[in-house]
Amino acid sequence: MSNKKADSKPQAKYPVNLLDTPFPMRGDLPKREPQWVKEWEERGIYEKIRAASAGRPKFILHDGPPYANGDIHLGHAVNKILKDIVVKSRNMAGFDAPYVPGWDCHGMPIEIQIEKQFGKSLPAAEVMSKARAYATEQIEKQKVGFKRLGVLGDWANPYKTMNFVNEAEELRALGKIIEKGYVYRGLKPVNWCFDCGSALAEAEVEYKDRTDPTIDVMFAFAEPEKTAQAFGLPALPRAEGGIVIWTTTPWTIPANQALNLHPEIVYALVDTERGLLIIAEERVEACMTDFKLTGRVVATAPGVKLAGLRFHHPLASAHPGYKRTAPVYLGDYVTTDTGTGVVHSSPAYGIEDFVSCKAHGMTDSDFINPVMGDGRYIESLPLFGGLSIWDANPKIVEALNAAGSLLRSEKYTHSYMHCWRHKTPIIYRATSQWFAGMDVTPRDGGKTLRETALEGVDATAFYPSWGKQRLFSMIANRPDWTLSRQRQWGVPMAFFVHKETGELHPRTLELLEEVAKRVEQSGIEAWQTLDPRELIGDDANLYEKNRDTLDVWFDSGTTHWHVLRGSHKDQLQFPADLYLEGSDQHRGWFHSSLLTASMIDGRAPYKGLLTHGFTVDGEGRKMSKSLGNGIDPHEVANRLGAEIIRLWIASTDYSGELAISEEILKRVTEGYRRIRNTLRFLLANLSDFDFAQHAVPVDEWLEIDRYAVAFSQQLQTELLGHYEKYEFHPVVAKLQTYCSEDLGGFYLDVLKDRLYTSAADSRARRSAQTALYHLTHGLLRVLAPFLSFTAEEAWKVFQPASDTIYTETYYAYPEVAGSAALIEKWALLRDVRGNVTKALEEARTANRIGSSLQAEVAVHASGARYDALTSLGDDLKFVLITSAATVVKVDDEAQESVDVAASKYQKCERCWHYREDVGAHADHPTLCGRCFSNLFENGEIRSAA
């Protein structure tokens, strides 16, 4: 370090060693941080980190790709900064931990943007070229934002799911799971968004409250004799009546094909003013009240006795097109929590209905499926053709009422499925899609996908641990994965499908590889322009190109294949050590990645999963435009500094919600200043210290210096343990305590007298500086993962010849003999010092003393405390920061106390101690004896402090 003193000030008559440093007190972060970002890029710091780490064990944090659309928000900042802390801490722990950022580029949001800008009639080729350009522009914009946050990575060479090599490798991954037998085509109800015009993944569905009409509808008796027999009656008492269902989806009534009862629930035949009604016995009283009817139970029967009975469609009298009957099927999923205990079944629009009807012998061609992809009924549907299902709801209620089938109608607010992009309601809709079968046995005869994935969950470490059960439950209960989408901007499911049978071409695997080669050269556009005859010759007359695209969750879910082992295999490796994302990714990227790796490799693609919560305001409310409580990371970085965002994230327990507000940021800023002031003190007091020239051997250090280094080494061991377990908030909490209490409140406070008043080149002062040198090395490195700009700024002052702190590893402190005993002893001394400080404060309040140096204390101590205090000899006064200190032995702890008296001596002009020998030298009447010695003779001798 430089040897410059603060020579801009006039020299004092009796100078002290007050040094300066180019590391300023004010961080001026908004101004300085962008300069560091620029410098890191220009000087190739990330590449230098990689070079320094070459040959070490690899640690791979695989970046879950954000979507290439829109500005980065606070959630992005949380995610990227947490990743940056992990990567930097692993590099400094001695690993080669590259960070390759990535982006998710295909899919609906970008396609929507292109439609907004250019309309919906663009040719497919133009949609793709404009989508590529748009995604590229968004990536560059987001990249600037991430770099501004101090995140180091391979920004020049990120992975993008739209890069040709990644698109091609994704097709090869598809080929792998087809080869293993997991993929099939079938008709099933899937999540369907009318605005997307496509199936949705489970992760693309969110729930919001919605108000819909709820109706109780009667299906009239079609087989009165059989119904009477089922209830043990010779005949029904009257002909009018039927079975009653309750539904919140009137629009499904036109597609009704069955009724479901629970086999063990008891059903009652109730005589009412509206005829005989069949209702679950335990729901009779509630239903009579709701229907405003009086009723008498005529007979009862368990559901199993009613199986196979048929009832007329409730609109049979309204239009001949509904003159059909619905059979009673049995289903364990029927409950009596609400409604009538009878479920109407439209198998095209409900998973349980679909499964039940399939189990009872219905085939795909039997299903009534009148709702088109845009949410309108087909024109040929009686009474409601061409209507949107939402517009049809009230008209269906009217028609049911006119037909005499409606018993009750009212509004009902419930949690309902919505598209996460459009925020509009979605439905289950039976469509022909490509699926990955969760319970399919692969061709090699191994375990099912579900079994393999659950084993993968068991083998994964979770941070926090509750994530394991959450993901396990999701995998255990999920339906088959709908792989296909009906869009343009996505990786094609590049199949040739037989026009009549719907079967895949027998050479599908070979053909997929041929398509992949073309995609590798010119992107997914190659499939759009491909003439089938190029690949299948005369078979082109029999087969058509499949127009479906892959679910974008397959894009990101196969990055373990097309990134870790594909585009970036030279830097990365499989499996990754860690995936780190928000808690929503248990049903998103964590989930899809697990399924694809289970199919391809029979294992999870990660060794560990780290989950963080979402940001909320200071009152725990989610951030929203309507509440006006959102916080923009750009604005905070430009006003307070990205370092404040980084410190906030690191100091917050990310396993729950991350609360942020102006008040919280204010507290974080105050904490930052304390750390910065500590660094400034360290750097200033090392500014005339050259380790090679001035370092003192460990065994010659003063005792308190040995203690400080031993204590810091012990703390570092704790901190590295936290870093290894990704526990960052304890790291910050302990470092803030270390800076404010262990250093600022104790060690540095004690040290000031020695640093400032001892002879500049004395052993006592150089001992202190040697200890500070080691402490600074250690402190900057454990701060660096989260206080990235500040640690680098301080490092360049501390070690100007070094390129960057980020090529360093955690500090190897010198070994201090007897460190455990030393730490234990000084813990006692600090405890006593606390009692002395309290006594001094009481004396100051009583106006008996001014500063602590005006005091002389007598410490009454027993046992180990007495031994520790007396071992310091005359240096005890320096530890207590008093002008004199004596120790009085007492028998036990009950007798321990502190006596404080004002010194009767003069104050030394230079060191401010009150001493008997002030003025002992006539030429220097305001100096004490030790200051005279330190300035003009050999200097005082200290051993402990």
Curated annotation (Swiss-Prot):
Amino-acid positions noted as binding ATP in the UniProt annotation, renumbered to this chain: 625
Domain of life: Bacteria
GO-annotated biological processes: isoleucyl-tRNA aminoacylation
Pfam family, one: tRNA-synt_1
Keywords, alphabetical: Aminoacyl-tRNA synthetase, ATP-binding, Cytoplasm, Ligase, Metal-binding, Nucleotide-binding, Protein biosynthesis, Zinc
Motif ('KMSKS' region): 622-626
Residues that hold Zn(2+) according to the record: 908, 911, 928, 931
Record-linked InterPro entries: aa-tRNA-synth_I_CS, aa-tRNA-synth_Ia, Anticodon_Ile_BEm, Ile-tRNA-ligase, Ile-tRNA-ligase_type1, Ile-tRNA_ligase, M/V/L/I-tRNA-synth_anticd-bd, Rossmann-like_a/b/a_fold
A GO-annotated cellular component: cytosol
Family that this chain belongs to: Belongs to the class-I aminoacyl-tRNA synthetase family. IleS type 1 subfamily.
Subunit structure: Monomer.
HAMAP family assigned to the protein according to its UniProt record, in alphabetical order: Ile_tRNA_synth_type1
Record protein name field: Isoleucine--tRNA ligase
Organism field: Burkholderia lata (strain ATCC 17760 / DSM 23089 / LMG 22485 / NCIMB 9086 / R18194 / 383)
